[in-house]
């Protein structure tokens, strides 16, 4: 895989730090952070500021500039997180006297108002039916993401050897965030699709493209997007929408939060709550429906 590089900032010490900082992350995270940090670098360059000499006031003024650019709150927070991360490293390595982000208030995200792409039950049924008709790989991705909640990278890195049986349960060994391995059960409704993707092989990538090559994260995204379009879903759908669907359906069906958290392998329950369709559930279950129905009954 081609290494991710950052455009030079004009300050060699900062560029060396940035390259080292970026190398500490997985390639997918590197690509994301490589789109965030240059915005800070350009802002500093436009004001003749050496990033290693930046102050808290500079970071706060930059955040105001980013906020005025039309980006979403989540994107602004992500930009800040990248900048705050590199300054934590700079401070730990004594490259700066003080961390300019230490007392900066992180941009708030009002998660209850965020729009998250989640499939309805009927949409997922159409997605699954369409995937089954397209190819074994499409079908496997539909169940791995939409029934088991696997991330795109986790699906792409699955191997035939990761499939096995423990105490009578079919399982997959998944390598998650932070390269943490986890053994997850394959539910019976998903088992046939996984076995069809394996196709009696004993080794190699579990998911394959039409050419027979292994898949990467972007391939999984393309397959999910293509399946959604073929199923008549007009809005953009990616693998994480399938993962959110798992969490949303689980919580809406009354499965305990702890169990859904374990299914999604979240470190904190707040992440599980924040990843499902809060807005949709809140609207559907809002108490005003029952109150209004009761009161309307008295009007005849």
Segments and roles (model prediction):
Residues 118, 178, 264-289:
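Catalytic-site neighborhood detector that most strongly recognizes the C-terminal catalytic loop/helix
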Residues 112, 121-152, 169, 178:
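Basic, Lys/Arg- and aromatic-enriched nucleic-acid-binding interface segment
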């Amino acid at each position: 895989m081609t290494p991710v590089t950052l455009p030079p900032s004009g300050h060699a010490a900062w560029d060396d730090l940035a390259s080292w900082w970026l190398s500490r992350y997985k390639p997918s995270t590197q690509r994301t952070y490589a789109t965030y940090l240059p915005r800070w670098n350009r802002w500093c360059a436009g004001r003749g500021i050496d990033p290693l000499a930046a102050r808290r006031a500079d970071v706060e003024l930059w955040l105001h500039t980013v906020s005025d650019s039309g980006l979403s709150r989540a994107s602004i927070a992500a930009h800040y997180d990248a900048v705050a991360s590199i300054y934590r490293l700079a401070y730990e390595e004594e490259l700066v006297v003080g961390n300019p982000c230490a007392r900066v208030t992180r941009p708030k995200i009002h998660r209850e108002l965020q729009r998250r792409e989640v499939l309805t039950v009927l949409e997922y049924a159409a997605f699954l039916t369409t995937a089954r008709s397209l190819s074994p790989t499409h079908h496997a991705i539909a169940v791995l993401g939409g029934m088991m909640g696997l991330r795109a990278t986790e699906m792409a890195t699955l191997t035939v050897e990761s499939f096995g049986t423990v105490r009578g349960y079919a399982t997959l060994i998944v390598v998650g965030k932070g390269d943490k391995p986890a053994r997850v059960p394959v539910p019976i409704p998903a088992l046939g699709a996984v076995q069809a993707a394996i196709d009696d092989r004993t080794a190699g990538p579990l998911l394959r493209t039409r050419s027979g090559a292994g898949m990467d994260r972007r391939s999984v995204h393309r397959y999910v997007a293509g399946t959604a379009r073929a199923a008549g879903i007009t809005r953009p759908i990616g693998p994480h929408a399938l993962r959110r669907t798992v969490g949303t359906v689980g919580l809406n069906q009354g499965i305990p939060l702890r169990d859904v958290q374990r299914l999604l392998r979240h470190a904190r329950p707040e992440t599980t709550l924040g990843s499902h369709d809060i807005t949709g559930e809140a609207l559907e279950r809002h108490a005003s429906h029952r109150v209004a129905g009761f009161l309307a009954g008295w009007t005849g």
